[in-house]
Amino acid sequence: MQPAGRKLAFVLASSDHGTMIVNRLDYRMVDAERGYGVGFQILQTAAFDVAEVKLMVDLLTLRRKHFGDGVVAIDCGANIGVHTIEWAKAMTGWGSVLAIEAQERIYYALAGNIAINNCFNAVAVHGAVSSESGILPIPNPNHSVSSSFGSLELRQRNGNEFIGQPIDYQNTVNVRKLTLDEFSLPRVDLIKLDIEGMELEAIEGASRTIAASRPIMPVEKAKIDAAQLRRALEARGYEVIEAGINVLAVHTSDGTLAEIRPEPQLAAQQAPAMA
């Protein structure tokens, strides 16, 4: 074998979530001591956002309590699958997960993590969730350069977040653009939207699904117009609970709402950053 001198980015880590494929370079340092990124947090603490993961599992358990077995959760912006894995393990025998990730290299890690953790009730899809079907050119970052890859915005705008490396929006790869309505799922209990500025488009593309199933929706608002997000959710009959850089939207007809309402203060204190 002729050594190629390659930098190794993706590694296996024995984490509290199970054996996980992580990018050891998935970080952006804020200063000499502090950084962020899914891989960074797992390698530093053996887990990613434990409080938020527990909250999501608790929400799924509540939906089972009120609506019975067959719970379905959609993880949009699944990254390497921390939420997907934890949800799938928790729902063994009574629920399933659809995980969607737009970045190809991260999608490979997501699919591998589903397989290596034997989550037979989870499915991974490579695509960008939007308001319409088609093809979306997205930037192609260097995964061997330290960056917070989960913070990558698929579209260029004024004020794109710096993730740790310059992003060339002319150097793109095509990815499938899809709507959640395309899946025609008969039941959906939770839709997590953490897709770096495309959350409003995803809601529009899930109009039929939302109207039919009235799922709980944790939505990141950091890179979109928060007032517009609130209006879009309230117009669909949702109560919007503030939770740091996210909102938790629960339909006013949902029997779980009365049990969820006491949680906003705790959720805001945690200020979760979904991934």
Roles of regions detected by a PLM:
Residues M1-Q103, Y108-N113, N117, I163-Q170, ...:
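S-adenosyl-L-methionine
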Residues G37, Q41-V72, I135-P137, S151-S213, ...:
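Short internal loop-to-helix segment that lines adenine-nucleotide cofactor pockets
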Residues A73-D75, V97-I100, L190-L193, M217-E220:
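Short catalytic-loop micro-motif centered on adjacent basic/acidic residues
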Residues A78, G127-S131, L180, I195, ...:
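Hydrophobic pocket-lining residues within nucleotide cofactor-binding pockets
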Residues G95, A122-V123, V188:
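Short, conserved active-site loop motifs that form the nucleotide-linked donor/cofactor pocket
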Residues A111, A115-H143:
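Core alpha/beta nucleotide-donor-binding catalytic domains of modification enzymes
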Residues C119, R231-E242:
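A SAM-dependent methyltransferase catalytic signature shared across enzymes that methylate proteins
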Residues V125-G127, Y238-N246:
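Conserved S-adenosyl-L-methionine
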